[in-house]
């Protein structure tokens, strides 16, 4: 007989109780951050978790690997976190990897203009009252305090509105702050992007003050920060992680999933077993045919250069009026990120690498001779953060009572980010622990 017991949730702030079956199995399909965060949260309260991953490694679009062309271990994409990303920080605390992020003690963002050679810093004060906008030394050059009031429109924007319909996408504030920040966060050119998602970015960053807006980077790589410690945590709590294990079909009965088909391997589900489907947005509808999910995606391009950064270079530099958009400085390399990069999908890599390096050399004062380089084009890095695509994001629950969705493409209220992925996994785990499935 399977028993249900009430257990306090160490990860939750509420006083509510959890319904936990002592011997049911939670099958998590996908070992990206959404799946790993769900698995970690469930394992932390004693649930039996089995993670099934198609690839031979975990992490999905958030992982590290050794690149022979550079002779270095790199991330498949550069990711910036903020100190106010409570789900991501909480996840790292749980798996014992909070010390893997590094950043300034204050909220400081450095920018450079390739066209004029100008440089400036945005310096937020710690409190929620944004007195920094009244300081010329802290706000964006050529802007006035009242210019920032325009951002309030994003906080109340409806789901159908684009950024260009809500704020003026011209002028110093837009070109020197809004466009770089929103382009990076949304991975879409802001004028056509979802104003609602842009509002969420502003609400969770600038509007919360500098204490929540310190930039943080995984200096030793995403794998060392998020993936390897999560796998160790899961295995230490009895979870099973199966790689090279592709889910090919779900047996979808009237109100529940009855079985999981992994080729010749078929797992029949017990009456209280649960499935968390944490696969990419383009895969989920092939497994759940009636599922509505985003259909358009945007690329991100990262260029890595095997060279020691010069002294004094900030760990992250925002760039305007160039191909380069963000320059990240690591101990053994310089890395450039370009968002909404579909225009480069078919571009020849070598000329593009030389173009990017010429900008990096100008920004850093390094020799113009290009070092060893490697370009990664992630063609479906994020769902397209457009109003119509945002409206297609499903909630976590499905009409099958033991099938739950997770992923940054679900309706988290945030764009496609690490924080969104982890929140979706946490939400899926919360549904599991607070719902009776039998």
Question: Residue locations for each model-derived region?
Answer:
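Extreme N-terminal leader/targeting segments of oxidoreductases
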Residues: 1-26, 44-45
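Mid-domain catalytic core of redox enzymes
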Residues: 2-9, 245-365
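Conserved flavin/dinucleotide-binding core of flavoenzymes
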Residues: 2-13, 123-125, 327-438
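N-terminal Rossmann-like FAD-binding beta1-loop-alpha1 element of flavoenzymes
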Residues: 24-51
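Glycine-rich FAD pyrophosphate-binding loop
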Residues: 43-68
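Glycine-rich active-site loop/strand segments that organize a redox cofactor
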Residues: 62-84, 151-152
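Mobile amphipathic helical/loop "lid" adjacent to a hydrophobic cofactor/ligand pocket
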Residues: 84-203, 212
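Helical element adjacent to the flavin cofactor pocket in flavoenzyme catalytic cores
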Residues: 201-263
